[in-house]
Amino acid sequence: AGLLNLLTICGWFGIFISRDKEKDMIWPDMLWFWIIAYDLWNFAYVYNCVGDHSFYAGAALLISCTIPAFFIKRGAWLQHRAHTLALWMMFTMAVPSFVTSSKFAVNASHNDAALMTVSAIALAANVAVALYQIYVIVRGRKNPLRDELYTDLEAYKSVREANI
């Protein structure tokens, strides 16, 4: 799922700085379906690799950048992700016991069925995004390394218009 998610990153040349006073980094081609697929993959990865950190380093950390990207500043998900991840890493390096042995620690179930279910959902979502992207590339005869792929979608247009 992670490799598929990596391969479906597109629209690099469409990144621009918003014209408002915040000067956010806007990536219009990084739309909701890719963000959800990324979130599912990243949660599955954290849950499978460091399960006892998955509540904070997985769910809470992903929600903290996805909610603003959907409801506050569309198109700025990558910037939100970089900020929240940096803050989280600084905090856990300064207070590592918070996620391991404090009263706020959340232990994962370590249940094989749960691990496989989360992974299967992440894989299915990323396969769906990859198939849709292939469809868009073939239909529009686009180069995913050079072109923005989703310029005909309303979500893309609204992100671009709101920030240019």
Regions found by a protein language model. Name each.
Residues 1-76:
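Generic multipass alpha-helical transmembrane bundles of integral membrane proteins
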Residues 57-163:
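C-terminal transmembrane-bundle signature of multipass membrane proteins
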